[in-house]
């Protein structure tokens, strides 16, 4: 079902394009690989496959516009899986959980490098993020997580003084918390539409 409303991020990205370059599937075609869905996952899969094996004939099909689904209508928060480490450790084991955390953290910089390489202005900022408590019940909730991260030597969160947290957050509601430099933001619509253009060039 077609979305009745377009989110701001996606609308802004579409408005910045002089030509949408929509190619409709009208006849039967053949390909080595067919990818269904033109969001982050579909486009990145196509890009990586083409990079590893340029001779592949890859077709990507999308019902609406590339990026018009979840990829173009999320909050644009670039947050790694750091705070999920303890849970993942119980489910998949320490080594795999560590790999998941470090991979998700390095992904921030890989996305930025990709945008820099292809001149995609996706408004990426990797300025870090706050993980805070706003009431007494929340205080200390992350302590066990931090200890687990330290034990596995992958901790990137550092406790920040209350006054500094409040200043950085712009609110006195924050009474305790940690800061991690490995967090950021992106204009999701511009990112996914930029990925589409790169994929078209490599087709």
Each language-model region and where it sits:
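Glycine-rich FAD pyrophosphate-binding loop
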Residues: 50-73
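Extreme N-terminal leader/targeting segments of oxidoreductases
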Residues: 1-33, 51-57, 83
């Amino acid at each position: 079902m077609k979305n009745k409303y377009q989110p701001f991020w996606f609308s802004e990205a579409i408005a910045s394009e002089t030509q949408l370059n929509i190619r409709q599937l009208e006849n039967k075609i053949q390909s080595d690989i067919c990818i269904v869905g033109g969001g982050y996952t579909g486009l990145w899969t196509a890009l990586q496959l083409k990079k590893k094996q340029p001779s592949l004939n890859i077709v990507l099909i999308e019902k609406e516009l590339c990026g018009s689904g979840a990829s173009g209508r999320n909050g644009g928060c670039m947050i790694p899986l750091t705070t999920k480490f303890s849970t993942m450790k119980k489910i998949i084991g320490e080594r795999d959980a560590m790999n998941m955390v470090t991979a998700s953290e390095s992904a921030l910089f890989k996305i930025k490098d990709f945008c820099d390489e292809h001149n995609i202005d996706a408004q990426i900022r990797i300025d870090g993020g706050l993980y805070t408590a706003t009431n007494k019940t929340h205080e200390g909730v992350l302590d066990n997580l931090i200890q687990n991260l330290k034990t596995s030597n992958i901790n990137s969160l550092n406790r920040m003084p209350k006054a500094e947290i409040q200043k950085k957050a712009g609110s006195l509601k924050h009474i305790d918390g940690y800061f991690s430099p490995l967090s950021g933001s992106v204009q999701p619509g511009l990112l996914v539409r930029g990925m589409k253009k790169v994929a078209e060039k490599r087709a």
